[in-house]
Regions:
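Extracytoplasmic/secretory soluble proteins
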Residues: 1-439
Length: 439
């Protein structure tokens, strides 16, 4: 009601939300599109874009980009990011303002790092997780794992599991939406040649490194089949570290999930990190063709990116009723409410609109400058030469399913190191033979 009290006089728009659980989002939206149900503004996960466009379910917003509202979106996102949610010339959505570059590394137990002198050697500190340009080669991790293994043979230096690929932490490929045909960023930042990721030297070197760690006893021996997860294993004291994407405020989240203080170290071959289309255009905000008034829907989308009052009302509710602004400029629950009993609070700005226009929520990991820190984090990255390209795979769904099945057969063993160094060549050959056989 408060949002409409603001929207109606200013924009002549009345808003009605349709709350959905994440698990039901894709099916519900798809049924609404195909069934002709009235639907205006919607989040679009990048992998759904091709099929929903093929269903004629998404409005091409190019027609609105020369309007004042379209220009306002470009002013916020920049020209490149404002048009990144495009396929076959159709502008289907705008990306959320969020951290979009994946700078990866290790999350490590602070007590073990302190005990073994690792923290002192590398200048590690609690809650020091902002990227400053300092990045380490993975050979440094080998030395750290060796120290931990010698001092604590009962503990696994590195936890991996077969269901969660670590490849994005080890090497950056522009996966061009589905990774069956990629740009090998590590080999050549400027190349636009599409290659088979699993035949590249970059991929082979990465899985060989994992196999060496596995043979040395540095990786959890049941990594291929284990389902417990890194947080559970660290909380139980069974592992020293795990691979993760790191960003400002990350270590507070890590402590909450693992129950222990952690340090973070950035690792990788590529110092800057890379921007691919799907890094930025992971979730987009678009308009359904079922919309009763696409032009007004576009004006609402523009408000999500340009009007702080709209985003704060949607995300935080009414000031001094649902949240209060603290002396440091951050927002928090009103007196008498907390995470267990709040009446209204969203945490969805990361997938729709411009969360940088909202108050930073004081969860213990962030200060009022947090959005500036995320933008600075993004600014380290370089754009892939294929940035803005998203392959339309809708005509190849059968082949992609067969390729995915082939990949799932061999990838977990390779990417947990479980094949050992002796098995890398043979398993890679089997994987590529299966991929070519699948089309």
């Amino acid at each position: 009601d408060a949002l409409n009290e603001y929207m109606i006089p200013k924009y002549h728009i009345e808003v009605e939300f349709l709350p959905l659980q994440y698990a039901e989002y894709q099916q519900t939206i798809q049924l609404m599109i195909s069934g002709g149900d009235e639907l205006d503004v919607m989040p679009i996960y990048y992998s759904n874009a091709s099929s929903w466009i093929a269903m004629n379910g998404i409005v091409d917003m190019n027609q609105y980009m020369d309007t004042p509202e379209g220009q306002a979106i470009k002013d916020v996102l920049g020209e490149a990011n404002a048009t990144v949610g495009s396929m076959n010339g159709i502008l289907f959505g705008f990306p959320a303002q969020k951290e979009s570059v994946e700078l990866g590394g290790l999350t490590m137990r602070a007590d073990i790092c302190d005990e073994l002198g690792i923290a002192e050697e590398y200048g590690l500190e609690l809650n020091q997780d902002e990227y400053t340009g300092k990045v380490y080669d993975w050979s440094v991790a080998t030395e750290i794992f060796k120290k931990v293994k010698e001092a604590h043979p009962e503990m696994t230096p590195l936890y991996l599991q077969g269901s969660a690929s670590p490849m994005r932490r080890l090497a950056f490929f522009d996966e061009l939406a589905d990774q069956f045909g990629v740009l090998d960023w590590e080999a050549d930042h400027d190349s636009t040649t599409v290659v088979n990721e699993f035949e590249t030297d970059t991929y082979k070197e990465a899985v060989t490194q994992l196999a060496e760690w596995f043979d040395a006893g540095y990786i959890y021996p049941d990594a291929l089949t284990d389902t417990q997860g890194s947080a559970v294993m660290m909380k139980a004291g069974n592992t020293f570290s795990y691979m993760s994407a790191i960003k400002p405020g990350y270590l507070v989240e890590a402590k909450a999930s693992t129950g222990t203080d952690c340090y973070a170290m950035y690792f990788g071959q590529d110092v800057e990190g890379g921007y691919s289309t799907t890094n930025v255009s992971f979730y987009d905000t678009g308009i359904a063709t079922n919309s009763a008034d696409p032009e007004m829907a576009f004006k609402f989308i523009s408000a999500l990116y340009t009007d702080p009052e709209v985003m704060n009302l949607w995300q935080n509710g009414i000031q001094d009723v649902n949240y209060k602004v603290l002396d440091d400029g951050t927002a928090y629950y009103v007196d008498g409410e907390d995470a267990s009993n709040f009446k209204y609070h969203q945490n969805t700005g990361w997938f729709m609109g411009n969360q940088f226009n909202t108050y930073v929520w004081n969860d213990g990991s962030k200060d009022a400058n947090y959005w500036d820190k995320l933008q600075h984090h993004n600014d380290w990255a370089q754009y892939s030469p294929a940035y803005g390209f998203m392959w339309d795979s809708s005509e190849y769904s059968t082949q992609i399913t067969a390729l995915q099945n082939a990949l799932n057969t061999y990838r977990p063993a390779l990417e947990t190191g479980s094949v050992g160094v002796a098995g890398v060549e043979e398993t890679l050959q089997k994987l590529n033979d299966a991929l070519y056989a699948a089309g």
